[in-house]
Swiss-Prot record:
Belongs to the UPF0276 family. This is UPF0276 protein HI_1600. Transmembrane segments: none annotated. Signal peptide: none annotated. NCBIfam families: PRK05409.1.
Length: 307
């Protein structure tokens, strides 16, 4: 089976819906995280096995901490490799972030965009690729604190690591938009103009919250608006949170269209939804929209992976 077209992240909440889909449908592949599924058993694993027989599988890591200082988690790598091999997957990606510092942090944190960080992350990616026996892809992440020691912008950093490590680029369109709005440092469209399009081989699209559930707008003594999030004040006109719990916004759909126009091939593109699940028909409609855009901009061959 080939990994191509439009996909939807496989979640336990959606298991029955996946199994009830007709053979000819818009969802052409699924994605899971090895951290969640390597040791899963029981009915959940049985249902996943059934889905994996019908759909090609992409494997997307959450906590390998490619930007971290601790040694790579060899047990996680072994579990990831076993999952890839068991389901004959041909694709693995991870986040450009770190999530450990003398313990697991349960969040994906950014590092300074520096040449030193490029060398560090690239070497760890090469180690992962050697262990897994395949080229992996690196995903741009959403982040909420920009390091003042950075010497390059986000897309330059991503390109430099991908070139140094000789890996693919997993483009998250929603993250590009969220970072562009929150930091105002890099226009999302300029990001897409500058990304190494020849390395882009996978795309995520998702929804975001335009105002955090814990946020309230207040006025300071100078009558300036601040966003108050969990007691901290941020001098921002708005704060976008990459939640994967909402429908995709129109501005992000527009950005996906622009990405398709820029790319020489149309990569497999996955809709992420992690909670606050609507009726399955609404998710399916979003996947259909991805497929329609892929068809609209299929000016060249469609990228695929043999699985």
């Amino acid at each position: 089976m080939k990994l191509q077209g439009a996909g939807l992240g496989y979640r336990r909440n959606l298991a029955e819906d996946f199994l009830q889909l007709p053979s000819n449908n818009a969802i052409q592949f699924i994605e899971v995280a090895p951290e969640n599924w390597s040791k899963m058993g029981g009915m959940a694993r049985y249902q996943f096995d059934q889905a994996a027989e019908r759909f090609p599988l992409a494997v997307h890591g959450l906590s390998l901490s490619l930007g971290g200082q601790a040694p790579l988690d060899r047990e996680l790598l072994r579990n990831t490799k076993a999952l890839i091999n068991q389901y004959n997957s041909s694709f693995f990606s991870e986040h450009l972030s770190y999530c450990e510092c003398e313990g697991h942090l349960y969040d994906l944190l950014p590092m300074p965009f520096t040449e030193e960080a490029v060398k560090h992350v690239a070497q760890r990616i090469r180690d992962v690729q050697d262990f897994l026996g395949l080229q992996i892809s690196l995903e741009n992440t959403s982040y909420y604190l920009h390091s003042p020691t950075s010497t390059m912008n986000e897309v330059e950093f991503l390109n430099a690591i991908a070139q140094e490590a000789d890996c693919g680029i997993h483009l998250d369109v929603n993250n590009i938009y969220v970072n562009g709005v929150n930091h105002g440092l890099l226009d999302p469209y300029i990001f897409l103009d500058q990304v190494d399009v020849k390395r882009v081989n996978y795309i995520h699209i998702a929804g975001h919250d335009e105002e955090h559930s814990a946020a309230q707008v207040v006025e300071n003594s100078a009558n300036e608006s601040f966003n108050k999030v969990k007691g901290a004040y941020r001098h921002l006109p708005e704060l976008l949170i990459d939640t994967h719990g909402e429908a995709v916004k129109g501005t992000v759909w527009d950005l996906l269209e622009y990405a398709y126009q820029r790319l020489p091939t149309i990569p497999p593109t996955l809709l992420e939804r992690d909670f606050n699940f609507p009726p399955f028909a609404e998710l399916y409609a979003e996947v259909e929209h991805i497929a329609q855009l892929q068809q609209k901009y299929a000016h060249t061959e469609v990228m695929s992976y043999a699985a």
